[in-house]
């Protein structure tokens, strides 16, 4: 049912799903590899699994751009990695633009084709390797307890 909600903007006034709607839902389930979850209630699955179900709902909507707000929040590292690898795979396989906000900059550097970085005085968009070379991450946080190591592409706690 959650995934079918992605098709709601396309249903008739009764909310009935068409054959095309059902096909889009089935495609989203297949792309996200969640067939084993389709008969479970949302309170029977983990937070990581729920995030993937919600991504399937977004895929079922079949838009060219998918915007996700902090999709890895409250997930452990394993589920974060699984989710980000899925997003990367979906972007490449479906040719959709997937834009997500995150505070997990280290993971975004590893997993993103491009990043948009907001600082206090500018907004910069580029590939992660170019952003590292530009030094943008060095000025991101004004604290003596954190530094960005460009050699390894990660923040280090001092």
Give the residues covered by each predicted segment.
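Conserved ABC ATPase "signature" region
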Residues: 4, 19-37
């Amino acid at each position: 049912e959650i995934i079918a909600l992605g098709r709601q903007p396309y249903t008739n006034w009764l909310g009935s799903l068409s054959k095309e709607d059902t096909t889009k839902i089935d495609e989203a389930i297949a792309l996200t590899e969640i067939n084993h979850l389709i008969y479970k209630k949302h309170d029977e699955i983990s937070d990581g699994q729920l995030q993937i179900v919600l991504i399937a709902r977004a895929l079922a909507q079949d838009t060219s751009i998918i915007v996700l707000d902090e999709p890895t929040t409250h997930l452990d590292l394993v589920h974060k990695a699984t989710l980000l690898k899925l997003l990367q795979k979906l972007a490449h396989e479906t040719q959709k633009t997937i834009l997500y906000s995150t505070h997990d900059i280290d993971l975004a550097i590893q997993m993103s084709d491009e990043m948009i970085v907001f600082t206090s005085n500018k907004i910069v968009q580029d590939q992660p390797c170019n952003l590292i070379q530009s030094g943008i991450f060095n000025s991101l946080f004004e604290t003596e307890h954190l530094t960005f190591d460009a050699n390894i592409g990660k923040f280090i706690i001092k």
